[in-house]
Design a protein with these regions (language model features):
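Short, solvent-exposed secondary-structure boundary motifs
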Residues: 1-2, 23-25, 137
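Acidic beta-strand-loop-alpha-helix segment within the catalytic core
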Residues: 11-98, 147-159
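Oxyanion/phosphate-interacting regions
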Residues: 75-82, 96-159
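Glycine/Thr-rich phosphate-binding loops of Rossmann-like dinucleotide-binding domains
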Residues: 1, 72, 118
Length: 159
């Protein structure tokens, strides 16, 4: 919204204890809505996610932030060892995680600051689509939790 593109989202999440159990990500300018409820699946505009499988593509699609491409993120991308050509997709807001949830992208490394309200809704969606969001610190994958005293997220990888 602030960047004057159509990729802003409204995010609504319900967090139970330390994990997301319900999420809605709506992109009003694009009229696209993703939602999920724990145990009931994930959806994009009424269609069950994931919509596509990674094996159907000739490229490995990596989602990255337009405004937050850090040296660490670039190094992470460079270190991905895959037999397919890498394709970088740049899109705004929570749509990055949603692209992975629907199978349009394979991975989203976020090696920079975000807040719990930035990720909770999309995390519920990717979780119900069969994907995951994991913390990523010092080259280690960790459980990604919510309802911490400080609402700043750790770095994470969605896939």
């Amino acid at each position: 919204f602030v960047k004057k593109n159509d990729e802003f989202t409204v995010n609504i999440a319900l967090i139970h204890k330390d994990k997301p159990v319900l999420g809605v990500v709506y992109a009003p300018a694009l009229d696209v809505c993703y939602w999920a409820k724990q145990g009931e699946g994930a959806f994009k505009d009424g269609k069950t996610l994931p919509l596509k499988a990674e094996s159907q593509r000739n490229t490995y699609k990596i989602v990255a932030s337009r405004s937050h491409m850090s040296d660490e993120t670039q190094a992470f991308i460079d270190a991905i060892d895959i037999d397919k050509e890498k394709e970088l997709i740049s899109i705004g807001s929570s749509l990055k995680i949603c692209l992975v949830a629907e199978g349009e992208a394979d991975i989203y490394p976020r090696l920079g600051p975000t807040m719990e309200w930035d990720t909770g809704a999309a995390h519920a969606i990717i979780q119900e689509s069969g994907g995951s969001v994991r913390g990523y610190i010092n080259f280690q994958y960790l459980k990604f939790i919510y309802n911490k005293k400080k609402l700043l997220n750790s770095w994470f990888v969605a896939q």
